[in-house]
Amino acid sequence: MLRRTLFVGAAAMASVLAVAAAPASAQIKIGSAGPMTGEYASFGKQLQDGAQQAVADINAKGGVLGKKLVLEIGDDACDPKQAVSVANKFADDGVKFVAGHFCSSSSIPASKVYTEEGILQITPASTNPKFTDEGAWNTFRTCGRDDQQGEVAGHTIATEYKDRKVAILQDNTTYGKGIADETKKFMNAAGKKEAMYQAYVPGESDYTALVSRLKEAGINLVYFGGYHKEIGQIVKQAAQQGLKATYLGPDSLVTKEFWQISGPAGEGVMMTFPADPRNLPSAKAVVDEFKKKGIDPEGYVLYTYAAVQVWAEAATKANTTDPKKVAAELKSGGPWPTVLGNISYNKKGDVTKANYVWYIWHDGNYHQM
């Protein structure tokens, strides 16, 4: 059993009171997990904000099947072992459904526990194909996949920047290497070869040696597979060293913390992300509610909201919170109305439509191109 063989340490776990005290029989426990602490905590906050607002809105309308939702927040710090601990804690607490995790390197090992313990999981952010390709009954996403995102990036580089000298940099994480390799695959298939493929160490503060190698190689376009903190530092240090290049990256750059790190050097950096859900008519009322609270529902906030929303819709239609029956309903039913618009699932648990587009950083904000 995974609960006996995998690491089960003390993981930071906060229980969020989503409803006034009520008998346990009148409650349904759900969870959301992500990096609430550590270098990716800004993304954990996005997941927490989305889940909390969804629970509040659902409870205000009577809950699910007449029962109020109680939300637990788990902190995995984007660490695989801690993610397993969080998953086991959710199982011990009787959680039926989890909106999470953020990092693919957390979602994938946690999913093994959820599969064994009979918990349905919908990630709003983990894009590595392996998460759903392994064929578990309980794994779903509201986001797209690296191969979908990499196809857009690879095709763009090969067709619109075919004369550039390209470097692909990646941080050797499940997410970063995954998206870099998918981009490389599609770029190569379109006839464009990279001049450099290089791994870098995440968590460092000095990337000047890496920048020097880029300059020496005459690189004038860099594609990053990794997270916003390191990418922001590399872009900033590249500007300080006088490297003139175009910078492209993945969906990890859709956080204002990127600009806080890069400063003006982030001007013109481009990244792939689905069409901004904040602008969708289906999200207007929820976006307005977030703004009243002083929250900008950027990045994965609405994707997490939608994860809770689509689970609640399927449970209501199935007339049960039994995870296997809800999972079957998600795949056979739909389309499901959410803040992201209508969502439908294929047999793997992937959304049938994930339209990635380009965004660009300008003057401290990112905009769809």
Language-model region placement:
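Extracytosolic ligand-binding ectodomains
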Residues: 1-9, 20, 25-369
